[in-house]
């Protein structure tokens, strides 16, 4: 809880080095002015630590495009149960020498070593984010839509499924928000550069709509 320092932000190399007690949101706040972000986005990002994210290989809605924590850590410093200090990984995106101990430690939930420092890989912030909400009268059509959407060239940045139980909770607070016969809903998000979203053929929006089941 005392290891809460952001050691360095290096936009030229798309890297931020932090101690494990730094909050996920603090990393986002520190890197956003440089035009970057750290993609892991668990629902607890406002109050979960980077060390906790690494220990569980946390992910969130954007894992569909960006993956989980394991894809966004370049290197670690840690102390093993025997009291040995180890350094894994490297400072660069391309690291092909030796055993990939970094990925081994990520998701180990503290059973292999205690993390003391993490070198995180940053990603450029998308300049445009767009969203579509789709309602379905049956689960099979919704499942078919998910398969079709994931086959598009423009991968969605988030794809969330809400079943009838979730929709009933929404109706309890906002009775007129959803069509009466809706039993499933998809919340679809795409991101990227303005040119990518506007001029890709077909556009992400048209591509998504074209892959929706006719029912």
Locations of the language-model features?
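Short basic, glycine-rich beta-strand/loop surfaces that mediate nucleic-acid
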Residues: 1
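FAD-binding subdomain of flavoenzyme oxidoreductases
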Residues: 5-160
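Short acidic (Asp/Glu) and glycine-rich catalytic loops that position anionic groups and cofactors
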Residues: 122-128, 180-187
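Active-site beta-loop-alpha junctions enriched in small/polar residues
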Residues: 162-164
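Short glycine/threonine-rich loop-to-helix capping motif typified by GTGT followed
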Residues: 168-179
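A conserved active-site cap/scaffold subdomain adjacent to cofactor or substrate pockets
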Residues: 182-198
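Conserved small/polar residues in nucleotide/adenosyl-binding loops
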Residues: 199-206
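Hydrophobic alpha-helical segments, chiefly the membrane-spanning helices
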Residues: 210-215
């Amino acid at each position: 809880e005392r290891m809460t320092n952001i050691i360095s932000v290096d936009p030229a190399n798309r890297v931020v080095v932090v101690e494990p007690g730094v909050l996920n949101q603090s990393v986002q706040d520190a890197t956003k002015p440089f035009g970057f972000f750290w993609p892991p986005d668990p629902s607890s990002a406002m109050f979960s630590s980077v060390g906790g994210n690494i220990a569980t290989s946390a992910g969130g809605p954007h894992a569909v495009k960006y993956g989980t924590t394991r894809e966004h850590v370049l290197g670690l410093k840690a102390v093993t149960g025997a009291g040995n200090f180890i350094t894994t990984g490297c400072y660069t995106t391309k690291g092909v020498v030796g055993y990939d101990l970094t990925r081994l430690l990520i998701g180990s939930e503290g059973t292999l070593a205690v993390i003391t420092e993490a070198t995180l890989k940053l990603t450029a912030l998308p300049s445009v984010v767009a969203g579509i909400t789709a309602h379905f009268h049956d689960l099979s059509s919704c499942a078919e839509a998910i398969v079709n959407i994931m086959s598009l060239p423009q991968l969605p940045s988030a794809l969330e499924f809400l079943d009838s139980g979730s929709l009933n909770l929404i109706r309890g607070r906002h009775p007129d928000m959803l069509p009466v016969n809706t039993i499933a809903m998809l919340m679809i998000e795409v991101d990227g550069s303005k040119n990518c979203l506007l001029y890709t053929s077909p556009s992400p929006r048209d591509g998504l709509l074209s892959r929706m089941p006719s029912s």
